[in-house]
């Protein structure tokens, strides 16, 4: 036998001896009590003359002395159990009962003295006085039966710390002391109040009131009490038991109504605490709720505090932590506390409640201030439960989210993100995710002001499991929809999101020799959240886009993910949508914002030098015969030349260079042909518009490449799409593609009919619902296509385009910008002399092609504008006045037009709607969508903001019906 075993044996023997001494103490105390009770009984007489006032109720026959019953605390507790717990049912037969007394170590003697209600006899005496008056006296004599019960008690092995070694070895140590009528039913069998073996002699959670206060509880718990539970959503709180929140303080260990001792007054306080630990209950903010052991587990056989009465009322009982819950014990019974053990558990799980049906009817869910207060408790189980429950409360409840912010709950949740335990920081992050969702921007600002973004990033770098990473990225996605938080996410979270999520889970490898295999399927939801977050922040400003483009590996991994999804025939997933929208935003202004962008710039064609042999005269620029005949009266860009080769590279393209390479163009074409998702179609067309914008080398290559890949017809087909934003994106892409002369010819033949159908007026009423921006985009595309393209102008006349243009000009119910855009198209058509006679034969007049701005709507413009009519332009004079496409400066057609940098762009949806008509310089880009309509908006998922009505987080599509969680 080694030293440890010897030491263990010695400690066990010592604890046994110590326990025997305690039993001897208890025996002496009980014997003293027995003598005291016997002396009291000698003074009690069952007669009408000295019956106690309480005898009128048939309860007890003890006397009052100075407002109290004679006897010590144990006797009073026993009396209170008879009075209060057993209710007002027939107790007339029960006179008294003594607490158990120990005759010798190992034995307990219980004495019961009862009345026999059937054995009561009445004696009637009649007396006649001298004056003839008769006096009748009736005396009742009751039969008293005394029963003595002896029980055997076995000693309990004690550990070196004075606590029982094993709970299994102490069964049947103590037996309850309820009356026999409560231990048996009407048939003589065990009654409903018999507790399990191993329970204490007296309930530790007795809280007896002062004399004169009496409430009868019918069966155990008060029927209308406002007991404390965690997640009961079916209980209606009675107003008389609802606690007043004013001045409310959670109960503390120092309160006078704490758990009562299980040994008699004769024992010491040390003995008391050796037999049971402190119970769990709600405490004040300065105290913990129990053990702070980091290894605290969640046992299923512990309950929580229950409340009856108001918080300020001391006459209540706290349910002990050993009480069983759920289907194991009915809620309408009273239970004795078992023998306390050295516990390793905390608060109980609600599994049994959820599985066994609805919670007990007397439970209530905690108030919001209570839940927020629990976030600050030192017990980790309470923190995690409170955070999880708070997440549940915030689900689709904007009022609760606002209240959490006003109650200062957000700083506490952000602080819990750094908690070492997963259950705590996961619950806190889930609550922040739901709070950050919705239209109340103040909640997002509050999270930002508490340094929520850096805290989320720290947690993301430590996270290794998918569920936690998903919640973190979802929270960042929700926050990214607010403009003031976007740059903070870029500055703090960009590299963490790229290095910890995008690259490792996409399957892309940094080394060229590594075999890249798609492995993002398992982490698709996490990648979707991350791409959505970056998608939102990419719309902030050029600085954000520059940092995203230059983030090592980000663009490569995004393109790899989209290629893998297309290869797996999954081109409509949310992941593809977010990645393509992010690539579309990164391609915005790419020809100006990439490093050394000037090396790709090209001069505008047909811009003659004002000095030298080709200086312009008053009749136009001089052209040599060689140039004239070498061109063959054709544009510089030969329409017959349909082949184009991208510049040769010495090394593979990486990073931002991939944004304008042939492989990414083929990705967009594949999505245009295969995808059915409107957002993906819009993003693909918008990316093509951005890449084809501007006078730069790769823009020219991409225009030709799209024609070679037969993508023009796919884009033209989008004009018939039922979603307006898809139509608008397709119109913008065709406009920039039409800069190529060959593309312009093809678009004029195949796209003009669809463009005309989308104009307001005529038989098509659906287009009246198109926004001003969409109508202007279509008009500008038509004007770009028919310029220098007589066949396209004829096609416009054949498809009743003139009627719709004149209607926009003359109707008076269109905006000023729409009228100006339509006027430009009408003037371009009138500039072709070949079309004037056919138009006049059809009944059109010259005045129909003039624009009277008095008919334009002034509702959208607070400033004054010119009421003059724009001059008509003769196409034959065009080359004599200004080169190529610059007949009319569009800046002269509206006072709100912008500078050259934003030409041919779609409107910024944050309110800047004045860029569309500015054509004075080179071609512009597709503005990233942002502002009031973030890059991804749909109900329940603002930029795929996500709320989860689950406490163990799951994806939104598979909500868990109340998963396992701990009781608060």
Curated annotation (Swiss-Prot):
Modified sites of kind Phosphotyrosine: 112, 217, 221, 228, 257, 280, 291, 865, 904
InterPro entries linked to this entry = ARM-like (IPR011989), ARM-type_fold (IPR016024), Armadillo (IPR000225), Plakophilin/d_Catenin (IPR028435)
Task: List residues, modification Phosphoserine.
Answer: 4, 47, 125, 225, 230, 252, 268-269, 288, 300, 320, 346, 349, 352, 617, 713, 811, 847, 857, 859, 861, 864, 868, 879, 899, 920, 943
Q: Localized where?
A: Cell junction, Adherens junction; Cytoplasm; Nucleus; Cell membrane
Q: Which keywords appear in this protein's UniProt record, sorted alphabetically?
A: Acetylation, Cell adhesion, Cell junction, Cell membrane, Coiled coil, Cytoplasm, Disease variant, Ectodermal dysplasia, Isopeptide bond, Membrane, Nucleus, Phosphoprotein, Repeat, Transcription, Transcription regulation, Ubl conjugation, Wnt signaling pathway
| UniProt-annotated stretches for the region Necessary and sufficient for interaction with CCDC85B | 1-357
Q: Name one GO biological process term.
A: negative regulation of intracellular signal transduction
GO cellular component terms, alphabetically, are: adherens junction; catenin complex; cell-cell junction; ciliary basal body; cytoplasm; cytosol; extracellular exosome; midbody
| Phosphothreonine, modified sites | 59, 304, 869, 906, 916
Give the matching Pfam families.
Arm
Comment, domains: A possible nuclear localization signal exists in all isoforms where Asp-626--631-Arg are deleted.
Could you say which protein family the record assigns here? Belongs to the beta-catenin family.
* Name of this chain's protein: Catenin delta-1
Instruction: Give the organism the record lists.
Output: Homo sapiens
Gene label: CTNND1
